[in-house]
């Protein structure tokens, strides 16, 4: 299993950027190009199913497991308050045997299936966000926030609310930043500070499949055949979307 590590002890914007690029480069197929663009495209499913992301702080490491064929989150690994490694996983996304290969530090006895599902709505419900529209948007983004949310699950007894908040922030700072340079650039622009998220970020996240499909099936030389609106105004030039990574949709048309 490939591991990609982000050092949160003294991170720089450059380190974060190259961390996101590494995720993108690990899952892309260099030979795939959609819509006459040079945007990276995820490769077809392969034998290596998962990617391991490590967040390192001065207090230890918390790891995230992502599916290589779509960057969906499958599991995370953290030490509890007695310094025992525990792996928590989404049952529909990964088996116990696969989890052992991904996070060998946790014994089978210390694997636990999460009581909720891997979609944003389910994680948000467990994050108990009370302000605004009660979605992940209210939590914000940023390196400092990633560190504080990680420390809330690092060497602590499990608290579902803290776990869900960590997952919401970590998914966006890894998978979503790899998919959308727009999000990666916001993190860098505000580095390392926490910043308020915005509707455009959420619109990107919920439209990844739609955007990928439009570029795959309805763009030539980087231009859409018609105007598209993905929730933040009309777009005709693919480059205006600042995409980082497209969903695998088969051989180019």
Swiss-Prot record:
Active site per database record: 176
Any single GO BP term: negative regulation of translation
Cited Gene3D superfamilies: Ricin (A subunit), domain 1, Ricin (A Subunit), domain 2
Keywords: Hydrolase, Plant defense, Protein synthesis inhibitor, Toxin
InterPro entries noted in UniProt: Ribosome-inact_prot_sf (IPR036041), Ribosome_inactivat_1/2 (IPR017989), Ribosome_inactivat_prot (IPR001574), Ribosome_inactivat_prot_CS (IPR017988), Ribosome_inactivat_prot_sub1 (IPR016138), Ribosome_inactivat_prot_sub2 (IPR016139)
GO MF annotations, alphabetized: rRNA N-glycosylase activity; toxin activity
Catalytic reactions of this protein: Endohydrolysis of the N-glycosidic bond at one specific adenosine on the 28S rRNA
PROSITE patterns hit by this protein: SHIGA_RICIN (PS00275)
EC number(s) per entry: 3.2.2.22
One matching Pfam family: RIP
Alphabetized PANTHER family for the sequence: PTHR33453, RIBOSOME-INACTIVATING PROTEIN
Protein family (similarity comment): Belongs to the ribosome-inactivating protein family. Type 1 RIP subfamily.
Summary of the function given for this chain in its UniProt record: Ribosome-inactivating protein of type 1, inhibits protein synthesis in animal cells.
Protein's UniProt name: Ribosome-inactivating protein saporin-7
Organism: Saponaria officinalis (Common soapwort)
Lineage, uppermost ranks: Eukaryota, Viridiplantae, Streptophyta, Embryophyta, Tracheophyta
């Amino acid at each position: 299993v490939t591991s990609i590590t982000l050092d949160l002890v003294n991170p720089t914007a450059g380190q974060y950027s190259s961390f996101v690029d590494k995720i993108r480069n690990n899952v892309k197929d260099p030979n795939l190009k959609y819509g006459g663009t040079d945007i990276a495209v995820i490769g077809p499913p392969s034998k290596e199913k998962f990617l391991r992301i490590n967040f390192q702080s001065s207090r230890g490491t918390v790891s995230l497991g992502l599916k290589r064929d779509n960057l969906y989150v499958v599991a995370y690994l953290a030490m509890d308050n007695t310094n025992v490694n525990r792996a928590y996983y989404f049952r529909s996304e990964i088996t116990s045997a696969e989890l052992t290969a991904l996070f060998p530090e946790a014994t089978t006895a210390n694997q636990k299936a999460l009581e909720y599902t891997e979609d944003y709505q389910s994680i948000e419900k467990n994050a108990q966000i009370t302000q605004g529209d009660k979605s992940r948007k209210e939590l914000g983004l940023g390196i400092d926030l990633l560190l504080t949310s990680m420390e809330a699950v690092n060497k602590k007894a499990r608290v579902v609310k803290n776990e869900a908040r960590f997952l919401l922030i970590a998914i966006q700072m890894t998978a979503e930043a790899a998919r959308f340079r727009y999000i990666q650039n916001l993190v860098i622009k505000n580095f390392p500070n926490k910043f308020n998220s915005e509707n455009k970020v959420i619109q990107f996240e919920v439209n990844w499949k739609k955007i990928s499909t439009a570029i795959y099936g309805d763009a030539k030389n980087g231009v859409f055949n018609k105007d598209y609106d993905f929730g933040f105004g009309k777009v005709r030039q693919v480059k205006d979307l600042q995409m980082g990574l497209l969903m695998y949709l088969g051989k180019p048309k």
